[in-house]
Amino acid sequence: MANKLRNYTINFGPQHPAAHGVLRMILELDGEQIVRADPHIGLLHRGTEKLAETKTYLQALPYMDRLDYVSMMVNEQAYCLAVEKLVGIDVPIRAQYIRVMFAEVTRILNHLMGIGSHAFDIGAMTAILYAFRDREELMDLYEAVSGARMHAAYFRPGGVYRDLPDFMPKYEGSKFRNAKVLKQLNESREGTMLDFIDAFCERFPKNIDTLETLLTDNRIWKQRTVGIGVVSPERAMQKGFTGVMLRGSGVEWDVRKTQPYEVYDKMDFDIPVGVNGDCYDRYLCRMEEMRQSVRIIKQCSEWLRVNPGPVITTNHKFAPPKRTEMKTGMEDLIHHFKLFTEGMHVPEGETYTAVEHPKGEFGVYIISDGANKPYRLKIRAPGFAHLQGMDEMAKGHMLADVVAIIGTQDIVFGEVDR
């Protein structure tokens, strides 16, 4: 009697270099063809939602940076908008422009990392080197406004921590940098931060073209992405896909256009949409989104140059007074002390606030019972919905294509596991 053939079951991750963190998948294979892909999540669970419920509204803010740790300021933006909606704070218009500008800087940061690591996982090593060159300059912007290159905590309920600085930090000489290299590195750092941003926006589209030269018409890249991980528009909506995962399937849905927040209704930009819903279309959408982000950043920079003003609310029950005022005025000192010891008291109510995160729709749902801490804080992470589509997207493909599908989903486990 012949032995009955069984499918082969293997572990993918959590130590796999292409797992984008701590993804563990149980893969059932028929030969080298995927029969079932079962993602196991929770290995990076830190209880963020529960931790935030034990902290004041201001103390909970830095937890947002650590969710999707590639798109830090957009996480902060969603949280701040939710708190502002509950409290009813009017955010100064200059602060809104700064927020939108840094949200788009963050979108470019995310897509450079996503495309670079996706290509690297598939076998195209050069792209990530070009991507990280540009990411380095954008991380310098983060550092200049907040002092931190990743976990900025720059956005605050009511505005932003401080106005844009009048200068950009310069590289200093060392035994690794000669005078020629130093001059080249500091070339665009002679003026203000807005000058640096404008110079970046001038040269970055050419750098996107370089990335496209490496990948877009590359025969091997197309063989690894065209027709892989196809999702129909109907299934994308049924699965709760958002962002590029939805637009790549041909559904024109972008929260910045459909439900504008901050000053996105004043911005002129387009929404790139795919046709086939495969890995290649999603890659093209991300490339075009970076170009559109440059357009938005330019518009914000032009407006910020000619419109000075406050960058945080003057209601000191929700935002601290300036340090100079705090050291000279008794009322300001009391506000400062109360805000940082007791925290702000948010009126009773509940709100769901969503933003167009680089990975999709990132939502924050807050229930307030009138105390200085959230009664309940729920985070709607886009990657969580995308990962549940893994089984459907991978079924019938080869084992090597799993890596391409994980890369196109652009998953970060800080937000998936929370």
Swiss-Prot record:
EC number: 7.1.1.-
Entry keyword annotation includes Lipoprotein: no
Taxonomic superkingdom: Bacteria
Molecular function terms, GO-annotated: NAD binding; NADH:ubiquinone reductase (non-electrogenic) activity; quinone binding
Localisation per UniProt entry: Cell inner membrane
UniProt keywords, alphabetically: Cell inner membrane, Cell membrane, Membrane, NAD, Quinone, Translocase, Transport, Ubiquinone
One cellular component term from this protein's GO annotations in UniProt: plasma membrane
Subunit composition and interactions: NDH-1 is composed of 14 different subunits. Subunits NuoB, C, D, E, F, and G constitute the peripheral sector of the complex.
Function comment: NDH-1 shuttles electrons from NADH, via FMN and iron-sulfur (Fe-S) centers, to quinones in the respiratory chain. The immediate electron acceptor for the enzyme in this species is believed to be ubiquinone. Couples the redox reaction to proton translocation (for every two electrons transferred, four hydrogen ions are translocated across the cytoplasmic membrane), and thus conserves the redox energy in a proton gradient.
Name of the protein this chain belongs to: NADH-quinone oxidoreductase subunit D
Lineage: Bacteria, Pseudomonadati, Pseudomonadota, Betaproteobacteria, Neisseriales
Gene encoding the protein: nuoD
